[in-house]
Amino acid sequence: MIKSWKPQELSISYHQFTVFQKDSTPPVMDWTDEAIEKGYAAADGAISFEAQRNTKAFILFRLNSSETVNSYEKKVTVPFHVTENGIHIESIMSKRLSFDLPKGDYQLTCWTVPAEMSDLHADTYIIDAVSV
């Protein structure tokens, strides 16, 4: 299955946003020096990605997409397991975004595209989920 959702707006706070299981609460992440260096923190079925700025941003979520990202500032890839159908993405003081990602194992790649490089003229985080 290949799918791409429309970009959704998210207000970034505390320089992070979290991908987590549907119908759950995102855990509090421990941003160790190692996590900061890697650009993500993981805990309890969730991944928090580092955000460049606390600002309005767009999340573009894609499943098994072959589209390339030509201009980006940072790229982080992590394993992720979806326990039930669906995930949420939110930042600490933002609304919750929902995506109907099927249950299974994935490699999540988060591409950080700053506003000056983005077609949306705002910081954009492209998240590619690839089935493994």
Swiss-Prot record:
Oligomer and partners: This protein is a subunit of a 75 kDa protein complex, which governs binding and entry of donor DNA. The complex is a tetramer of two subunits of the DNA-entry nuclease and two subunits of a competence-specific protein. Only the complex is able to bind ds- and ss-DNA.
GO BP terms, alphabetized: establishment of competence for transformation
Sorted UniProt keywords: Cell membrane, Competence, Membrane
One GO cellular component term noted in the UniProt record for this chain: plasma membrane
Native source organism of the sequence: Bacillus subtilis (strain 168)
Location(s) in or outside the cell: Cell membrane
Pfam families listed in its UniProt record: ComJ
InterPro entries named among the record's database cross-references: ComJ_sf (IPR038691), Competence_nuclease_inhibitor (IPR020354)
Stated role: Plays a role in the competence of cells to be transformed. It inhibits the activity of the DNA-entry nuclease.
Membrane association type: Peripheral membrane protein
Name of the molecule in the record: DNA-entry nuclease inhibitor
Gene: nin
